[in-house]
Curated annotation (Swiss-Prot):
Enzyme Commission code(s) on record: 7.1.1.9
Taxonomic source organism: Gazella cuvieri
Membrane side Mitochondrial matrix: residue ranges: 1-15, 67-72, 153-155, 224-232
Membrane-side (Mitochondrial intermembrane) residue stretches: 35-40, 106-128, 184-190, 257-261
Recorded GO MF terms: cytochrome-c oxidase activity
Protein name: Cytochrome c oxidase subunit 3
Gene expressing this chain: MT-CO3
Length: 261
């Protein structure tokens, strides 16, 4: 074994990018099968392989960072740049949905009745469940910041409490969103209003679930004393992602729920 004379992490060959890509293919194909043939077999297979890939990839990264010491300051700097670029790519992803919404709503076509919301659509009241959802996510933004400050100050118990509150609020948001979808007086097939509403809020909801998963992993890692006040990039990345999810929701609330109604 050669001695490493640099501060960078030469990653070992890993099967997880390949299995992750295959699970994504299975999930997207399974989604189409579910929509068109009402069969969830392929979707469940895709979700299962995705969960297994996530578990094993996370396990490898935790081992490399916490137990093998591969995440030197230089490596952490690279990971921070990577996370920033990833969040920028997510901003552009959601920009497409806002573009579609404003393109349709600012100049409604005669097919929509020349008005927005389109004729026959009864939008949700922005001062009911959507406003509660907004307050839940804003509260979770406060609690994740509390968790971050507690971690930097070395206060483990407060960090765990704040992180648990954030996860609980994230799960509560998801349940509220699911109930709102169930009771909505329009569907994804109700023209451009239904499609832009459900695609934009649905992808945001998916990001909340991903962010909650990220935070749950951080919670269990903190229970096992993986984070210190000066070495906790895994948690920092999760906090950045959660704040991004917060900000996207504020734009969704103001644009689609409040102005769009």
């Amino acid at each position: 074994m050669t001695h490493q004379t640099h501060a960078y992490h030469m990653v070992n060959p890993s099967p997880w990018p390949l299995t992750g890509a295959l699970s994504a293919l299975l999930m997207t194909s399974g989604l189409i099968m579910w929509f068109h043939f009402n069969s969830t077999t392929l979707l469940m297979l895709g979700l299962t392989t995705n969960m297994l890939t996530m578990y094993q990839w996370w396990r490898d990264v935790v081992r490399e960072s916490t137990f093998q010491g591969h995440h030197t300051p230089n490596v952490q700097k690279g990971l921070r740049y990577g996370m920033i670029l990833f969040i920028i790519s997510e901003v552009l992803f959601f920009t497409g949905f806002f573009w579609a919404f404003y393109h349709s709503s600012l100049a409604p076509t005669p097919e929509l009745g020349g008005c927005w919301p389109p004729t026959g659509i009864h939008p949700l009241n922005p001062l009911e469940v959507p406003l509660l959802n907004t307050s839940v996510l804003l509260a979770s933004g406060v609690s994740i910041t509390w968790a971050h400050h507690s971690l930097m100050e070395g206060n483990r118990n407060h960090m765990l409490q704040a992180l648990f509150i954030t996860i609980a609020l994230g799960v509560y948001f998801t349940l509220l969103q699911a109930s709102e979808y169930y009771e909505a007086p329009f569907t994804i097939s109700d023209g451009v209003y239904g499609s832009t509403f459900f695609v934009a809020t649905g992808f945001h909801g998916l990001h909340v679930i991903i962010g909650s998963t990220f935070l749950i992993v951080c919670f269990f890692r903190q229970l096992k004393f993986h984070f210190t006040s000066n070495h906790h990039f895994g948690f920092e990345a999760a906090a950045w992602y959660w704040h991004f999810v917060d900000v996207v929701w504020l734009f969704l609330y103001v644009s689609i729920y409040w102005w769009g109604s």
